């Protein structure tokens, strides 16, 4: 009698394969996780002073919501079809517990309350160094339960290149977007807003924050952070903008790269206290490990093969 044995093809075996669906594993690692069409805006407008964004001009922008009670939490950015990068503090409760299945993501929205498509969350990943009583390692990743469908309202943003040094952003203009509060009772926060800001040196930023009794900032402003804001204050990210992108748009190609994630600040738009952002280039390897692992999981599913004896 022939006996069939069930043999499982595992991920470790697949990694020895030189080519999978025409693309080598090693070349995928070297190439990084940016999609080739990332960072292109279907609607390109000039930002003058900041205000309400042209609808769908930042198509990677997402809103993160709490399920029960239903309320808006934070912003985030699509970096591929199943991954949204945001701030760790958006994904952890005040008691240090992960939100996990108590949140969902809304993509393709301009009016965050009345437009867009909801996606369920498969997994929440918070950087292993993050502590809810600290501002360090403030980065997290949301993995969606199914891939988003790209269109003129939904696109991925580029992230910094894999295995490259920090880019000097001092004196560079960057852009933030979000549905956070504006401080003006007559202005709604349900429509996406945009603001161009100058980057502030970490040295100057640290001088300002060292004057505060910040228990969450015992190591000061580090190289894993970016500061941006006007010396006179008046315009800044605020409550509800957390987790959203700090972006740089290449003036030649028009391509947009997310360089930071809205993390924290001293109140909102205070003079000489710029907003502080998690520097994405410090965490590209971390993002690479997670997102590449997810792509491998989809490529190398466990497949049963029956071999007759």
Swiss-Prot record:
Listed PANTHER family: ACROSIN-RELATED, HYALIN
Keyword Phosphoprotein applies: no
Subunit structure: Clotting factor G is a heterodimer composed of two non-covalently associated subunits, alpha and beta. Upon activation, converted to a two-chain active form linked by a disulfide bond. Forms a covalent heterodimer with intracellular coagulation inhibitor 3/LICI-3.
Family: Belongs to the peptidase S1 family.
Function: Component of the heterodimer clotting factor G which may play a role in defense mechanisms against fungi. Initiates a (1->3)-beta-glucan-sensing clotting pathway whereby the alpha subunit binds to glucans containing (1->3)-beta linkages, which are components of the fungal cell wall, and the beta subunit catalyzes the activation of proclotting enzyme.
Expressed in which tissues: Expressed in the hemocytes (at protein level).
EC number(s) from the headed UniProt entry: 3.4.21.85
A Pfam match: Trypsin
GO terms, biological process: hemolymph coagulation; protein processing
Keyword Signal in record: yes
Cross-referenced CDD domains: Tryp_SPc (cd00190)
Catalytic machinery residues: 89 (charge relay system), 138 (charge relay system), 242 (charge relay system)
GO molecular function, one term: serine-type peptidase activity
Regulation of activity: Binding to (1->3)-beta-D-glucan to alpha subunit, induces autocatalysis and activation of beta subunit. Inhibited by intracellular coagulation inhibitor 3/LICI-3 and to a lesser extend by intracellular coagulation inhibitor 2/LICI-2.
Annotated glycan sites: 100, 206
UniProt signal peptide: 1-31
Catalysed reactions listed for this entry: Selective cleavage of 98-Arg-|-Ile-99 bond in Limulus proclotting enzyme to form active clotting enzyme
Keyword annotations from UniProtKB, A to Z: Disulfide bond, Glycoprotein, Hemolymph clotting, Hydrolase, Protease, Serine protease, Signal, Zymogen
EC class name: hydrolase
Disulfide bonds: 38-158, 74-90, 205-227, 238-268
Occurrences of domain Peptidase S1 (ranges): 47-292
Annotated InterPro entries: Peptidase_S1_PA, Peptidase_S1_PA_chymotrypsin, Peptidase_S1A, Trypsin_dom, TRYPSIN_HIS, TRYPSIN_SER
Biotech / industrial applications: Clotting factor G is a component of the Limulus test used to detect bacterial endotoxins in fluids.
The protein's name in its UniProt record: Clotting factor G beta subunit
